[in-house]
Amino acid sequence: LDNIEMHWKQSDKIIEKTPEEKATIIAAEMEKWIGATVARGGEAVASYNILSEPLAEQVDGNTFDWGAFMGETDYVRAAVQMARDTVSHNLNLYVSNTFAPEDDVVAKADQLIALVSSFEDSKTVIDGYNILLNVKYSTDAATQLANETAISNMFKAFAATGKKVRISNFRIGVADAQSISADVRTAVAEYCAYILQ
């Protein structure tokens, strides 16, 4: 007999960890990931979104729930501390969330402000809000006035916190228009300017 190979397959063995062990393991992996990301950016990068989409209600298999292992506020506090401890220069750390046309943007702003406030303590400071802003311009005057009022009130709520606010992924669409005339394009441009002011 020659060239005989034998293979055994052993069934998977699950070694269950205690909640404390899981938290320790997850925190160590988080520290590696955040540390490597922030260190790689070096002094050239001074701003990071430390938390993205905390108000998202849809959680699927692609979403890792840090809070389930480390605590709902503790994981954010740990992430902020890890990021700040990694570099010697000042970092601006933001909490980022999408605001869509179908949202009650004022209520959502209030919800995000309250959430950020719950994360902060004497050692944990979040510098600002990163707003992924998607809006619609309406050709209906009353609807558009309501849109502008809501956006204005949203920004007033954020301004009242004294924190920085930045807009990213800014998108604007046109509602209730079959075609977009030159006048509508001008009105959309004015709405963009209104938002950015």
Question: Whereabouts are the PLM-identified features?
Answer:
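Catalytic metal-binding/acid-base residues of hydrolase active sites
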Residues: P54-L55, F99, L132-N134, R171
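Structural recognition of alpha->loop->beta junctions
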Residues: A36-A46, L115-N130, E190-Q197
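Structural recognition of the beta-strand scaffold that forms the well-ordered cores
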Residues: L1, A46-I50, N92-V95, D127-L132, ...
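Substrate-binding cleft of secreted/luminal carbohydrate-active enzymes
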Residues: L133-N134, V165-D176, D183-Q197
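Long, low-complexity, intrinsically disordered polar/charged segments
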Residues: L112-E148
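Aromatic-lined glycan-binding groove of carbohydrate-active enzymes
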Residues: S122, M154-R171
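Active-site cleft segment of glycoside hydrolase catalytic domains centered on the general acid/base Glu
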Residues: H7-L91, V95-I113, T139-N153, Q178-E190
